[in-house]
């Protein structure tokens, strides 16, 4: 399994158990699903609860939402367009410092900055239609995931977007 973690905070943002793709080498787009589950349950794709277990759902609290948000404990936040631009300035500066700390070469840093700029240009025009989510630590300096609802095959599909160069892949 691959866990995609926020490079700055270490928060788990998503795993490869979700359907995802890389767009133009700069954005991860992760398909989400609406789910309902008993409080505390984590349902992974392919998991099959035992049919012999008694159903104890009668007294349990049921939570509903997007699988990615519930499983990774992402926290919704809000931004105006101006606030988001201010956030991006601080975020890109912190990322560049992190890349230097990781001893990335100048050419790697320049390529990552170019890709990050490309990703920002893709999301800024649709900012008013997006929802914003931060990682479990609620650190406002970390990566902010962007949620967009798109029409796919006449169905509304929630797609969570992450800046590729703000994530670290951890194989477990």
Swiss-Prot record:
Residues 1-172 form the TCTP domain. One of its GO terms (molecular function) is calcium ion binding. InterPro entries: Mss4-like_sf, Mss4/transl-control_tumour, TCTP, Translation_control_tumour_CS, Translational_control_tumour_p. Expressed by the venom gland. GO terms for cellular component: cytoplasm; extracellular region. It is found in: Secreted. It comes from the Eukaryota. Secretion of this protein from cells may proceed via an ER/Golgi-independent pathway, probably mediated by secreted vesicles called exosomes. Venom protein that causes edema, enhances vascular permeability and is likely related to the inflammatory activity of the venom. This is Translationally-controlled tumor protein homolog. It comes from Loxosceles intermedia.
